[in-house]
Amino acid sequence: MAHETSFNDALDYIYIANSMNDRAFLIAEPHPEQPNVDGQDQDDAELEELDDMAVTDDGQLEDTNNNNNSKRYYSSGKRRADFIGSLALKPPPTDVNTTTTTAGSPLATAALAAAAASASVAAAAARITAKAAHRALTTKQDATSSPASSPALQLIDMDNNYTNVAVGLGAMLLNDTLLLEGNDSSLFGEMLANRSGQLDLINGTGGLNVTTSKVAEDDFTQLLRMAVTSVLLGLMILVTIIGNVFVIAAIILERNLQNVANYLVASLAVADLFVACLVMPLGAVYEISQGWILGPELCDIWTSCDVLCCTASILHLVAIAVDRYWAVTNIDYIHSRTSNRVFMMIFCVWTAAVIVSLAPQFGWKDPDYLQRIEQQKCMVSQDVSYQVFATCCTFYVPLLVILALYWKIYQTARKRIHRRRPRPVDAAVNNNQPDGGAATDTKLHRLRLRLGRFSTAKSKTGSAVGVSGPASGGRALGLVDGNSTNTVNTVEDTEFSSSNVDSKSRAGVEAPSTSGNQIATVSHLVALAKQQGKSTAKSSAAVNGMAPSGRQEDDGQRPEHGEQEDREELEDQDEQVGPQPTTATSATTAAGTNESEDQCKANGVEVLEDPQLQQQLEQVQQLQKSVKSGGGGGASTSNATTITSISALSPQTPTSQGVGIAAAAAGPMTAKTSTLTSCNQSHPLCGTANESPSTPEPRSRQPTTPQQQPHQQAHQQQQQQQQLSSIANPMQKVNKRKETLEAKRERKAAKTLAIITGAFVVCWLPFFVMALTMPLCAACQISDSVASLFLWLGYFNSTLNPVIYTIFSPEFRQAFKRILFGGHRPVHYRSGKL
């Protein structure tokens, strides 16, 4: 049996609840009543306001005269905050002309129940819906005594999915389309059957067509959404935990990763691990349940941990950028970067994060905080001043600092890459030397460039083998220890300091240099190649891994991994180079002979794999022997038989226990040469460096007269020039290849910095723009889905950090492999620097 009903002014408001968590939304409420037939007057201003309001085709409220009434007023001139606060206490309206009580908000009551039923699809909720609607329909008024006048509905928040449900339900009640007698569930069933149709809400003589939206999601769709959300968020949490645990474990277990620069990386991993363990799980519960159901106390704890851990993670990125910048631009920073200094940086980062996170707990909250909790919304304090303070301290200022520092680092690396070009080598050319000496010097210099990837040997005590002359005219050549303290050179990489090896690290005695030229030996080439390799590594040490630093034996610092990884960045065919033992002996020093740690081959000493280059080096060695043989006959005072030496300057690289062994030409007959004695007879470059006076090799030769000596010397020099001329042709490609490498290194440096800064900006920028917009723009509405996406995108930065800050380090990669596959490093292992 159908019933007729009239709303008149009975409609107070529509107050609908989100089905999953009873989150309340204001959907609609009436404007001041229109004049009824008994002549009751209304305020002219309110009538004019009512006439201005209209509902668009898509259900949005529009002010036809652009009076902005929809933003200012909701009911009888009340502002939204006051109106919402009075909703819960508003009694059912009564007709002032009669004693008959009209229906008390039947549409609101039915809409609330319908929303609850749409969530659980439970029979009990459906019965409540049906009974509430039945009571509203059975409340009648005498249509003849009180003609019906339709209420004017002001529709608010029409983009909410449940708005059209409520309006559609009201239309069904008004149009008397449901038969409710004897069937409590018929209302719910009818709404499901009619979910996609159109219902006509009668408004006087006109009509408003409202399309009803889906009353309830299917059980399968609901479960599927929850399952997909749970799996995705669960995987993200798991990956974040595993990644950061691996970083922490690698630093703890690997001795070569235990250095002061990696302390910042470890602290960053701890902050990201807290995000994964304390913040993400509660956030996942919030997302799956679509509302905060854990109470206000836990909401305070969750928001505080969220701000604390995320702020600490971001500020650690700033600290790492500052550390790298100082390492690149300040040559003395490598000595002042102590454990205490780094720990102070970490302490400042966590202290700032605690201050920002605990400020709301000491009263810096907005007045609507508790009301949001009742609506099952858990958010950080929306106080405008706090949001400006928090977002600036947490993101905007750190963003500017990071961008500025990494831009400076990129400019420095780019400048050094372009400066690393072949330069003419100073040759100690005697006036009696033929013109062919200059060409010989150039060829050997080019060969030195080809040796850039050769890793020199190191000794257990860190001895450095050097060849130097006096400061006035001599040039220092040295094999720098792999464990020596590496400084970041701020001068051009191909130009070494004019001073000799630092006096603090030298224990050798320089022998005075004579006018004779130094003999260009293979060890000289290797030494120069070592210096070239060291300057190459410095150019982007702060770009690809941690900033370069060294190990000082007195304070127990471990060698950095930055130098080793940077060489991999800068060479297109890099290999991991292990340490090579070196035994240094000298007639001028008492350094003694140190027992080597391992066979050079077992330690993976890199040898030149290019057969052509090996052949060229063997030719140079043979040339050296011929020079030695030529210098053994007679007391010749001519230097024409000696080959032009490659002179360079020793870099200002202080070593831990470096021993500089001075070696200079004591005379034409006693010139000292530096050779590499092979420990592996199959390869001439794998062995220990020995410094010994050269003695004439015994050989049979016919006595020569003084008249024959010039001819023999000229013949020997001609043979030497012919031998070296065979090396010239392959060297013509060096410059072109070097330019290609420079462009590649520059692109790789830019790519690395773009990954570091780009990941940070992409992950956090949307969230912090939204966080600053919401309190400043009250009229701006951001959907819950978009807000959740931006929040979890920021959390995703904690997932990326362990990848970004370790993937460029080969030592971290090797450590991860050992952790995964159970490998272990030998006890005597020491990390060598490239």
Curated annotation (Swiss-Prot):
Tell me the classification of the organism that encodes this protein: Eukaryota, Metazoa, Ecdysozoa, Arthropoda, Hexapoda
Glycosylation positions?
A: 68, 97, 161, 175, 183, 194, 203, 209
Record-annotated disulphide pairs: 299-378
Reported effect of changing residue 96 to A? Answer: In strain: CA-008, CA-009, CA-011, CA-013, CA-015, CA-026, CA-031, CA-033, CA-034, CA-035, CA-037, CA-040, CA-048, CA-052, CA-055, CA-057, CA-060, CA-061, CA-063, CA-064, CA-065, CA-069, CA-072, CA-073, CA-075, CA-088, CA-090, CA-093, CA-095, CA-096, CA-100, CA-114, CA-120, CA-129, CA-132, CA-133, CA-140, CA-147, NC-010, NC-011, NC-012, NC-014, NC-015, NC-021, NC-023, NC-033, NC-034, NC-036, NC-037, NC-038, NC-039, NC-040, NC-042, NC-044, NC-046, NC-047, NC-051, NC-052, NC-054, NC-057, NC-066, NC-069, NC-073, NC-081, NC-084, NC-086, NC-089, NC-092, NC-094, NC-096, NC-097, NC-101, NC-103, NC-104, NC-107, NC-108, NC-118, NC-119, NC-121, NC-123, NC-124, NC-127, NC-128, NC-129, NC-131, NC-134, NC-136, NC-137, NC-138, NC-141, NC-144, NC-148 and Oregon-R
Gene for this chain: 5-HT1A
Keyword Repressor in annotation:
no
Q: What protein am I looking at?
A: 5-hydroxytryptamine receptor 2A
Q: Which UniProt keywords apply?
A: Cell membrane, Disulfide bond, G-protein coupled receptor, Glycoprotein, Membrane, Receptor, Transducer, Transmembrane, Transmembrane helix
The record lists the effect of residue 52 to E as: In strain: NC-103 and NC-118
PANTHER family this protein is in?
Answer: 5-HYDROXYTRYPTAMINE RECEPTOR 1B-LIKE ISOFORM X1, ADRENERGIC RECEPTOR-RELATED G-PROTEIN COUPLED RECEPTOR
Q: Where in the cell is it found?
A: Cell membrane
Any ranges marked Extracellular in the topology annotation, and which? 1-230, 286-300, 365-391, 777-785
